Amino acid sequence: VETASEKNFSRLENFPLNIWEQDIAVGLTGSYLCTKYFGFQISQNKDGGSIVNISSDLGVMAPDQRLYEEEGIPKDQQNVKPVTYSVVKSGLIGLTRYIATYWSDKNVRCNAMCPGGVENGQPGDFLDKVHARIPMNRLAKSDEYQGTLLWMLSDASSYLNGAIISVDGGRTAW
């Protein structure tokens, strides 16, 4: 299981190239290197194995920047979800699909889990806005992803390869 990310809130028109490069290096290049080295090792096992990349619901949909707006701050100065977050997370989906076909002859499966957010003390007004965009009307609890992840890694999902599985309370269904 592999996941890497950096948080840098900055508006697109002011987003520094060095932060772009840093975020891509951590989130995408880091994942590529882990997959390259550990995936190769898995491919040498006679029984193969499973790789699960952790993407995000924001790897399959654009972030709703209105969620991050704060009253009293001009629109052009509002914090936003950084451009690199969705770029990295959608890039992980591409990497997952590539690896799913690359080592499939060696019984290496590669899938991606795309979790939504976790409720962890965010402000109430933010949670209200997020909940309104999720059919289950809530964010996940911290232990609600492990069942899906364990299944994806287990032999119970032995024919699952190249799948992009959203675990987001239905958010990406809308």
PLM segments and residue spans:
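Conserved internal alpha-helix within the Rossmann fold of NAD(P)-dependent oxidoreductases
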Residues: G30-T35, S50, V60, L92, ...
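A conserved structural motif in NAD(P)-dependent oxidoreductases
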Residues: I134-Y145, A156
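Short, small/polar-rich loop/turn modules that mediate ligand/substrate recognition or access, typified
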Residues: S104-R109, L160-G162
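Short C-terminal tail/terminal secondary-structure segment
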Residues: F9, E70-I73, L150, N161-W174
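Amphipathic alpha-helical dimer-interface segment in Rossmann-like NAD(P)H-dependent oxidoreductases
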Residues: V26-K46, L58-A62, A100-T101, D105, ...
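Conserved mid-core segment of classical short-chain dehydrogenase/reductases
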Residues: V1-E21, P63-N79, T84, Q122-D128
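Catalytic Tyr-X3-Lys loop
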Residues: E6-Y32, V52, Y85-V87, L92, ...
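Conserved SDR Rossmann-fold cofactor-binding beta-strand/turn motif
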Residues: R109-E119, L153, S166-D168
